[in-house]
């Protein structure tokens, strides 16, 4: 049996760093090296930390709460000592270690027990090949989520992490530009070896590959005699030993004298807890049960909170089937094309409902409605006046007259259709749509053409 535990590291979504007022900007692609720094985050002599970023602490509490953790009301900052080029102070400020209680502990998320969730500061970015150290990252607030070793396969790990990321996106807890990293702990108790930790794996693909390689390596007889730390070589697809695993005493944890103890009032925790939305998993079950939606469509709706809430606000006011179709397909289509999130544009629910009612009442064709919807970005409008210019052809006699004209103008397509090339019918339908400025009903047009071509 394989036992796998995770330590997930994510950047908390804040505007400023944890102990200074420098902007929280992630990655060299967003800023030049060492331009977003100050004496505090570069550990200049005499520089003292500011009070911890309240937004970061509150976000950490929300993360712990949504993972079902018990919140500890008293938090004591620690100094975690180790020697590495990216750590200018020689220690990391964290709420973990021998003398600390984490922000949250003893939680559970999707049947996986959460040991703890705690907050800490990120070190700088060090490039061992060039020796360059970029302090833009130094001091960014990190959340670390530690699970019990409850996983038994790589796929189980990946599925769980995907659900975790989606859930935390509902509370906008993590910086979406920064991604996550994971330390993976693997042991095979039947082989009587020690636990192996694989550090700093930076993508779901690499996490999966690292786990599968490490299980295979240990089963082949390379069992660790002592706990050890390894790294994953992405290019070679293997894990490489870095060092023996450190124990807590190796980090020489001491209480941080420059930072005050954090005391959480009960009312503060209750307020944060009451502000939490339903989780994606809860919404999924609700949408399927309440609106009889297929699971696949419900999964699309619940990937993002703003889409799920948008749907819930319109579904009782229009045909539910139409609401599902136009939210999961057409709304997402225009957002993806514009490379925008729903909360980055101004699409009013009443305008969307109005458009769907025009379709439902056969005032306009779906093709014309899609054209109008395309114009809803960046800002929606009442579609009724626009629809009046392009009202649907209601007379079958009028539509039949257009179809006869198209048949007359396209003898080659007619000949192809009658010789068995059925795709030619779509060509003729397209010509009708073009002639009528998409005011013709697609289904009716097809039926009339098929009848006329018999």
Predicted regions: what they are:
Residues 292, 314-323, 363, 419-423:
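Structural motif
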Residues 39-43, 141-149, 191-195, 309-314, ...:
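Short, hydrophobic beta-strand segments
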Residues 269-275, 312-318, 352-364:
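Extended, non-catalytic structural segments that build the interaction scaffolds
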Residues 343-353, 366-434:
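Strongly charged, low-complexity linkers/loops
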Residues 13, 216, 308, 328-336, ...:
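Amphipathic alpha-helical core segments of compact helical bundles
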Residues 180-190, 289-312, 320-338, 376-378:
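Core structural elements
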Residues 1-278, 289-291, 295, 317-320, ...:
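Basic, nucleic-acid-interacting segments
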């Amino acid at each position: 049996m394989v036992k796998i535990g995770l330590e997930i590291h994510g950047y908390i979504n804040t505007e400023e760093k944890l102990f200074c007022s420098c902007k929280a900007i992630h990655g060299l692609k967003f800023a030049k090296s060492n331009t977003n720094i100050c004496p505090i985050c570069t550990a200049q002599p005499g520089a003292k930390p500011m009070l911890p970023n309240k937004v970061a602490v509150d976000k950490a509490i929300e993360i712990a709460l949504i993972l079902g953790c018990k919140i500890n009301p008293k938090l004591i900052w620690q100094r975690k000592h180790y020697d590495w080029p990216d750590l200018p102070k020689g220690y990391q400020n964290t709420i973990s270690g021998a003398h600390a209680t984490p922000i949250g502990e003893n939680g559970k998320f999707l049947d996986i027990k959460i040991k703890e969730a705690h907050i800490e500061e990120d070190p700088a970015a060090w490039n061992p090949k060039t020796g360059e150290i970029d302090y833009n990252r130094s001091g960014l607030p990190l959340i670390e989520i530690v699970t019990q070793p409850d996983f038994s396969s790589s796929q189980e790990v990946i599925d769980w992490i995907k659900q975790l990321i989606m859930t935390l996106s509902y509370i906008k807890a993590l910086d979406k530009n920064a991604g996550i990293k994971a330390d993976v702990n693997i042991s095979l108790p039947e082989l009587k070896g020690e636990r192996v930790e694989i550090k700093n794996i930076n993508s779901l693909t690499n996490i999966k590959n690292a786990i599968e390689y490490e299980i295979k390596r240990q089963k082949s007889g390379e069992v660790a005699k002592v706990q050890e730390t390894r790294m994953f070589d992405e290019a070679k697809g293997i894990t490489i030993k870095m060092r023996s695993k450190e124990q807590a005493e190796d980090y020489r944890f001491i209480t941080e004298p420059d930072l005050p103890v954090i005391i959480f009032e009960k009312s503060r925790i209750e307020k944060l807890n009451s502000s939490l939305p339903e989780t994606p998993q809860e919404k999924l079950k609700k949408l399927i049960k309440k609106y009889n939606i297929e699971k696949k469509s419900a999964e699309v709706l619940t990937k993002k909170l703003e889409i799920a809430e948008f749907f819930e606000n319109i579904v009782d006011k229009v045909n539910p089937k139409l609401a599902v179709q136009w939210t999961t397909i057409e709304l997402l289509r225009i957002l993806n094309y514009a490379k925008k999130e729903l909360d980055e544009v101004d699409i009013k629910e009443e305008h969307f409902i109005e458009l769907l009612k025009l379709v439902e009442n056969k005032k306009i064709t779906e093709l014309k409605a899609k054209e109008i919807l395309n114009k809803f970005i960046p800002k929606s409008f009442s579609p009724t006046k626009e629809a009046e210019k392009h009202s649907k052809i209601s007379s079958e006699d009028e539509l039949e007259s257009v179809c006869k004209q198209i048949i007359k103008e396209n003898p080659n397509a007619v000949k192809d259709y009658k010789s068995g090339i059925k795709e030619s019918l779509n060509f003729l339908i397209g010509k009708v749509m073009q002639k009528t400025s998409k005011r013709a009903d697609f289904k009716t047009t097809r039926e009339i053409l098929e009848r006329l071509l018999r």
